[in-house]
Amino acid sequence: MSEIRLYVSTTESQAEQILDLLSEVFGEEDFAIGTTEVDEKRDIWEASVYMMAEDEAQVRSRVETALKSGFPDAQLLREVIPDVDWVVKSLEGLKPVRAGRFLVHGSHDRDKVRPGDIAIEIDAGQAFGTGHHGTTAGCLEVIDRVVRSRRVRNALDLGTGSGVLAIAVRKLKNIPVLATDIDPIATRVAAENVRRNGIASGIVTRTAPGFHSTAFSEHGPFDLIIANILARPLIRMAPQLAAHLAPAGSVILSGILAAQRWKVIAAYSGARLRHVRTIWRNGWVTIHFDRP
C-alpha cells in the first residue's frame, strides 16, 4: 500500500508554526511530521504529515480542521509516495564507512573487512541507518568511546532504524540491548539485520512510539541510551529519557543540526545530565551526556 504525504507550501516561519500545530494534533501517534526547505532564495518550505493510504481520510479531516483555526488561507496539498525497492535503488555505489573501530558495509563489500575491524553488515533499505549519514557515523564514534571507558551493563537504542547502533553496542560488549522504533517496518528491518550479523539472542526489537511500551520498564533502567532521531522530539522527551537512565549512565543523542545543539544541550542539562562532548559531522552533531 502506498504512503501519502499531505503538506502545505509556505514560508519557513509559517512552516514551523504549522509543524507545532501538527505536533499538537497528532502527539505521539504513528504519523511522521516534518518541515523541508524547497527553495532557500524564495523562502519556500513545506510542512508535511505522512500516513498510509488507509489513514488518509481521517488524517486529512483532522489537519483541515486544525488549519482552519490558525491558518485559514493555507492550501493542503497531496502527494502519493510510490513503493520503491530501496535496496536495489540505493545499494549501488555505497562504500564502507569507518567510525571508531567500526566498519559498516553492505553485503557486496565483505572483502573490505580488515583484521581488527568490528564489522557491521547493513544493506541500504527502507529503514534509516547505513553509516553513511553524519548522525549515524557520529553515534558510532561516541559509542566506541563510551563502551570502552564506562561501565555499561545494558543499553537502549531509541529510534533504531536499521538497528546499526544496537548492533554496534552488542558487538562491542556482550550486553542486552533493547532496540525500539515507532515504525514497524524499521523494527522488522532491524530484527533482520540483527540476525544477519549473528547476534539475534542479545538484542530485543520492539515497535513503540516514544516511551509508550512496557518494554522500557521490563528492560530498564539503562546504563546507555542512544537516540538518533530529530532535535524536536529529543527536546520534548528529555525528562522521560532521563527517567529511564540508570545512575552514572550515559546518553548519546543525534539527528541534530549544528544550529539546534544549544536547545538540546539546555533541555538535557535541565534534566540534570552533564554535557560531556559534541561530535561534528557534515553539519550534524552528536552529543554525549553523562549522569553525574
Curated annotation (Swiss-Prot):
InterPro entries: Ribosomal_L11_MeTrfase_PrmA, Ribosomal_PrmA_MeTrfase, SAM-dependent_MTases_sf. It is an enzyme of class 2 (transferase). GO terms for biological process: methylation. Pfam families: PrmA (PF06325). Its EC number is 2.1.1.-. It comes from the Bacteria. One of its GO terms (molecular function) is protein-lysine N-methyltransferase activity. It catalyses: L-lysyl-[protein] + 3 S-adenosyl-L-methionine = N(6),N(6),N(6)-trimethyl-L-lysyl-[protein] + 3 S-adenosyl-L-homocysteine + 3 H(+). Keywords: Cytoplasm, Methyltransferase, S-adenosyl-L-methionine, Transferase. GO terms for cellular component: cytoplasm. It is found in: Cytoplasm. CDD domains: AdoMet_MTases (cd02440). S-adenosyl-L-methionine binds at residues 136, 159, 181, 228. Methylates ribosomal protein L11. Belongs to the methyltransferase superfamily. PrmA family. This is Ribosomal protein L11 methyltransferase. It comes from Rhizobium etli (strain CIAT 652). The gene is prmA.
